[in-house]
Amino acid sequence: MQYINQSLVSEIRQKFCNVNTCPISGDRIFFENAGGALTLKSALETTTKFASIPDNQGRDNAASKALNDVIKNAKSDLSALFNTQSGEFFMGESGTELLFRLIRNAVLASPSGGSIVGTSLEHPASRSAAKKWSNEMEYTYLSVPHCVKTGTVDPKNYASKISDTTRVVTIVHASPVTGMGTKIKEISKIVRQKAPLAFIIVDGIQHAAHGGIDIESYDIDGYVISPYKMFSRHGFGIAWVSDRLRTAPHEKLDGGPSDNWELGTRDTGAYATMSDVKEYMCWLGKEFTKNNDSREQIKAAGVAIQDYERKMTDTLLHGLDNLKGLADFEDVEIIGGLNNSSREGLVSFRIKDYPSEKIVRYLNNQGIRTHTRKCDHYSENILKPLGWDDCVRVSICHYNTLSEIKKFLSCMAAFRDK
């Protein structure tokens, strides 16, 4: 199999908006992909096209029927993108809102008494919802501790928290602070052995852009993404629910279809952008497989993305040619360590006893966009056990280049020399 090279990266970058330049601040290198990925040009064009159409779905006219077909096609494309053979996709306000909604409905569809199991690695979107509904239902909330050293969760650590009265289990597919992925299939297998009827809800928001989703293999009940972190745009979230959760009691209009999860008129253009994402992944996958099946192309693209981003983060950490990597700088500490196979396109670090926001501000002045994570309600679950007040998050994607990494390392060397 071939891999993404710098020539292909140039072609990839032609597919995206604002690759080199921020429309507000000017030229910049974008290493803030965990905050939101770049948007496909095709997704922007699709959004513009559908934003001007006044018609709604469900009417007896050609435009309305066409909109219905677009949504139907988008759901089929989502099925290929995420590999689902059953269940239902639907749209909501955001990824966070959908996690709250799925967790709420999973809890309300479960027997009284028991527990919800989550992990200290999770984003507050799932942890907050799980804790709220544990209190509402008088459940026990149990948290699986993540490994501070590796920045991820060992699936075996779930075993002691799961019992036959576990009602809901939440899993984060990748952390937006540590940058580490989790082993969904292994965790799910442990859950099913002890609590076969528990609902398993996965936060896929951070993972989605970094190389492959395979829901069919996970044995779960819910999966949520934020499309603006998967090459689409802001303004909506996408959720998948299993048939078991789809048919469970949930919010719906009185007299409407019993298994419908959509609330209100959907943004057809938003759905259509997910077809653009699917087509992009197929286009990329064709570089690595001769198979004409779209799912195989998407899988090939995912493997290539993972490999490329691994090489890029290795360069960030270990350097290249005469450029030192972050690991070579004195007093630099890196979340998850240096050789972590769970890393997904993200490096979080600090310079000991030095404010991270000053580093981020310096890099921003050099035209490199990164982000400060502080010990607040978003990140204290990761930073507090480390004894850190903050960190610098450098988050890349497969459209970033080796020359951009070199510029970052060069700027960090100049910063340290000061």
Predicted regions and their residues:
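Pyridoxal 5′-phosphate
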Residues: 1-418
